[in-house]
Amino acid sequence: MSDYQAILPLALIGLFILSQVLYLLASAVDFYLYSLPVNWVDMSEVGLLGPGDHPYIVLFYPVLNELEETMRTTLTSLGALDYPRDRYRVVAIPNAGDTDTVASLERLQREFPFLQLMPVPPTSDASWQVVWDAWNGNDKAYWWHRGRRANIRDLPPKKTRQLIYAFYTTVAEFAGREDFLIDYIDADSCPPSDHLLAAAVGIRHYDVLQTQNIAGNLNHTMAASWHAFDHMAWDGLKYPHLSANGRQPYWVLGKGTFFRASDLVTLGGFHPWLTIEDPEVGMRFWVNGRRLGIIENPLIEEVPSTLMKGITQRKRWVAGFFQSLNSPLREMGMSRWQRFKAWLIFLPCLSLSVNALGIPIGVWAMWTWLDDTSILPLWTVGLAAFNVATYAATLLVMYRSTWKRSALVLGSRRARLWYLLRVNPVFLSIWWLVWLVPLWIGYRMYVHDRGLVWERTEKINANEPLMQQLVR
């Protein structure tokens, strides 16, 4: 017998055991997250709001090279908001150099008189001084005071820069007046009519509010179905448990997020040097004692209709996750245990990489077991059986939640069944293998310090028919 023939069985057994242990650890993380309590915003309290109980809300709408039709669909939903008209404003914040989008928004202002426009100038403009002054006096803006990009004013041209300018400019306008809430959404985000009312209720109990999300075009293409399931499994099922009575670090989702303006000023605003701002700002709020509340009635958004566009979106998420979980955690003052708990948020996504090993070695193990030529110790088969049972139970929970939530955007049982068919366990296994691509690209973006330019997720106004039905 050659050395190769002697070593191969041991190597296969070792790889099988490794994959099963990793799956077991991933299941343990899931169990921990699902065991955490959820702090829901109680919408039954809306009726208790008096005339003075509606905080002023500024809703920022950052856009970049967007279709006018997509923005019209979003603005149609914003026009149906149920909130005192003198207690909120909607402010579109395109880059000043994005002349096509600015022109589209100016045309849309004729249809939607509530829409205000704040073009964001280059950082060389004198109006940015309000930002530099705020950061100079606030050590919580650690990126401005320490590190290789300290005091660099040439901020990367992406959504975060637009939010930074709009936020501090608005704070300066409100100086000496009442505190207010800020909310921001994406170009395609269509909030429900009670979106702002939920904020008025929730902010009485919590410091940060996060609205859940759901895809409206989930049956548009197979790729859209798979992309939408990410939101079903994360935004709609697992994410709410991060509220956890303040026990667990949390991220925010980057749309439908409410902060008190005074809190965001105190804690330094948004970090401009990360691919996405959502994870870092949420964890900075958590480590400074701000509690999270979850708004159940979701924003309706559009997911990419092709795999390549979905990979582009997800590689940016992954890069931002790695960036946010590195030096920022120490800069914001997290202990080692707190940093460990922060990493647990990313592990369910990162554990998808185990499939690169687990699926092929699992196929081999199953084949040899059925062929009665298995060389695996009996206890490893028991471990695998436990993992399979845990996986089946997890899928059952996901499908039950998906069936319930899909009713929000699909009008018939047939359409909902069709969606469940498109995300069956076999197809999900394929999709989770595809996830290896953005995981790898996103990791390389993190290692090489890329992702500072906004790679827009292209929207095609896929939700217009749905929103025409819902907004009447």
Please give the residue ranges for each predicted region:
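N-proximal low-complexity "stem/linker" segments adjacent to membrane-targeting elements
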Residues: 1-76
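Juxtamembrane C-terminal module of membrane proteins
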Residues: 25-56, 330-342, 371-472
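Cell-envelope/extracellular polymer assembly enzymes that use nucleotide-activated donors
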Residues: 56-58, 89, 280
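Short, acidic, metal-binding catalytic loop of nucleotide-sugar glycosyltransferases
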Residues: 75-87, 111
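A conserved acidic beta->alpha catalytic loop
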Residues: 94-110, 121-129
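Long helical/loop segments within the catalytic core of UDP-sugar-dependent glycosyltransferases
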Residues: 118-119, 126-176, 193-274, 311, ...
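Short beta-strand-to-loop acidic/aromatic patch adjacent to the donor-nucleotide binding site
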Residues: 175-190
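Catalytic donor-sugar/metal-binding loop of nucleotide-sugar-dependent glycosyltransferases
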Residues: 283-300
